[in-house]
Amino acid sequence: MDLKLLNDQGQAATFSAPDTIFGRDFNEALVHQIVVAFQANARSGNRAQKDRAEVKHSTKKPWRQKGTGRARAGMTSSPLWRGGGRAFPNSPEENFSQKVNKKMYRAGIRSILSQLAREDRVAVVDTFTLESPKTKLAAAKLKSLGLDSVLIITDNVDENVYLATRNLPHVAVVEPRYADPLSLIHYKKVLITKPAIAQLEEMLG
């Protein structure tokens, strides 16, 4: 698969990327599965409800068992009553995680990268470095490359790049092992350094 190789002025040449990573068919069902699993695994329980033992209530029987013509009632904490406990309350300890096999996850990442390459949303650079940790420098460099919303995948995130890009709203910088499916899809472009492509090939190939 041929990708654009950009220089510092944004001029493009051609880079031959490995087909093992960028030449796969798009598997929509698999990509959907790993994205949903990624979101589920990032979710934490934040809902809490009370069951009938936890709500504040009296243990007095509302009325006698027989003779009133009304339905039997033992306590006002019953789930049948307004203000009573829930029969099956939500708990912060709920586990939302979904298991995805490593082989499936890697295949899904390859599928996403291949589709992004076909849509011309992947570009390559030799390296991505900055002289100092200034957001202005990072913004100017990305502007010269013609990039605004971009995920930068580099073999090693140095301190200058991290500090300079963390305040840019539509820019993220990660190492290959942290390139998750949601981020790959979210950003308009993916910029990858040559050493990072070698690492991706080693991880996913």
Curated annotation (Swiss-Prot):
GO terms for molecular function: rRNA binding; structural constituent of ribosome. Pfam families: Ribosomal_L4. GO terms for biological process: translation. InterPro entries: Ribosomal_uL4, Ribosomal_uL4-like, Ribosomal_uL4_dom_sf. Residues 43-95 are annotated as: Disordered. Residues 48-57 have a biased composition (Basic and acidic residues). The keyword rRNA-binding applies. Residues 58-69 have a biased composition (Basic residues). One of its GO terms (cellular component) is ribosome. Keywords: Ribonucleoprotein, Ribosomal protein, RNA-binding, rRNA-binding. The keyword Disulfide bond does not apply. Part of the 50S ribosomal subunit. Belongs to the universal ribosomal protein uL4 family. One of the primary rRNA binding proteins, this protein initially binds near the 5'-end of the 23S rRNA. It is important during the early stages of 50S assembly. It makes multiple contacts with different domains of the 23S rRNA in the assembled 50S subunit and ribosome. Forms part of the polypeptide exit tunnel. This is Large ribosomal subunit protein uL4.
